[in-house]
């Protein structure tokens, strides 16, 4: 379902429009002015996908029905820096849920695997109450400092919380 103005609408997903057919979650929609398109990044079958549309309410379609890379990953968040460089933050299942970043191709359809860099791994006591989980990344930039906001611990634990790390580069290192 979606909200347009004060009206609720329902969008049925057409299986032919995207990779995968189960476990859809964590969609984020971005408008890229340069392309005059909306990009929806989402997780499906524990893979990262991106679909495009001319409207923020869709329909969204994948021209090529495949993930942005083959490794299982979730919780994507796009960040385009002031110089136009696109970065994708996401969770890899490397010793728990760990937040990583990679530069994207200019068309925003693939990550550049040679640029993969670890950002945040659950290490602080509050992050380890039930599981090694750092997830749900989002990046903001203010006055030359990058802020990576994330959730940590297991979502079913009362200690599930929000943390942040800072860096002078979108690729880290994050402190």
Each language-model region and where it sits:
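Asp-box/WD-like beta-propeller blade repeats and closely related beta-sheet repeat scaffolds
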Residues: 46-82, 92
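Single conserved hydrophobic/aromatic residue that forms the stacking wall/gate
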Residues: 1-5, 10
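Loop/turn-rich, solvent-exposed surfaces of beta-rich toroidal or solenoidal domains
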Residues: 132-175
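Surface loop/turn motifs at the tips and blade-to-blade linkers of beta-strand repeat domains
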Residues: 18-20, 67-70, 121, 128-130
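Hydrophobic core segments of beta-strands in well-ordered, beta-rich domains
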Residues: 18-20, 24-45, 77-95, 99-102, ...
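Structural motif
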Residues: 47-51, 96-103, 157-164
């Amino acid at each position: 379902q979606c909200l347009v103005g004060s009206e609720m609408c329902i969008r049925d997903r057409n299986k032919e429009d995207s990779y995968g057919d189960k476990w859809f979650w964590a969609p984020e929609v971005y408008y890229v002015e340069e392309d005059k398109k909306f990009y929806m990044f989402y997780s499906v079958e524990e893979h990262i996908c991106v679909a495009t549309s001319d409207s923020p309410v869709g329909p969204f379609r994948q021209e090529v029905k495949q993930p942005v890379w083959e490794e299982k990953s979730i919780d994507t968040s796009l960040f385009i820096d002031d110089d136009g460089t696109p970065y994708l933050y996401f969770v890899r299942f490397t010793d728990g849920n760990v937040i990583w970043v990679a530069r994207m191709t200019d068309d925003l359809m693939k990550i550049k695997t040679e640029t993969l860099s670890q950002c945040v791994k659950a290490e602080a006591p509050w992050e380890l109450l039930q599981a090694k989980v750092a997830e749900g990344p989002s990046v903001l930039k203010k006055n030359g400092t990058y802020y990576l906001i994330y959730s940590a611990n297991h979502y079913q634990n009362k200690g599930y919380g929000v943390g942040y790390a800072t860096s002078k580069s979108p690729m880290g290192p994050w402190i």
